[in-house]
Regions:
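Extended, low-polarity transmembrane helix blocks
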Residues: 1-33, 52-60, 64, 71-135
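Membrane-interface interhelical connector segments
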Residues: 32-50, 54
Length: 135
């Protein structure tokens, strides 16, 4: 079933790149558009511990792990870190707002977090740096 394996690997590639680009955009926004100081201030209003430190860590995880997902390198680690990142966003910001993004709800963070964890579980697929390095 070579054709099915190729289809599976192509689907994993599309999922990795799609999720990775979204995370890169959010990390980039936190670092360079809003700035981590402003993000830290926002985090403080949500009761996030050490909000300025956490803002820097979250921005870094989203940017670096997002790039890792796109490339398919260290994919299980990147997926787990992003899943934890989204769990934090769910807990501190979105859980009580209902499901819809238009109301700052949880649907996007759940979809992103579950997607990242799924990629961590299934691996990067054949079209990845992980596979090229023998992983």
């Amino acid at each position: 079933m070579r054709g099915m394996e190729t289809l599976t690997d192509a689907a994993i590639l599309l999922a990795r790149v799609g999720l990775g680009v979204v995370f890169v955009a959010h990390g980039w926004q936190k670092f360079f558009t809003l700035g981590v100081t402003r993000v830290g201030e926002q985090f403080g209003t949500y009761g996030v511990p050490q909000p300025f430190v956490t803002a820097s860590i979250v921005a870094g995880v989203e940017l670096v792990a997002g790039i890792a997902l796109v490339a398919g390198i260290l994919t299980p680690l990147a997926g787990i870190l992003l899943g934890v990142d989204m769990a934090g966003a769910l807990y501190f910001v979105h859980a009580t707002n209902g499901p819809f993004v238009s109301q700052n709800g949880w649907e996007l963070v759940v979809a992103l977090g579950v997607g990242a964890l799924l990629i961590a579980a299934v691996g990067a697929g054949r079209f990845s740096v992980d596979r090229a390095l023998g992983g």
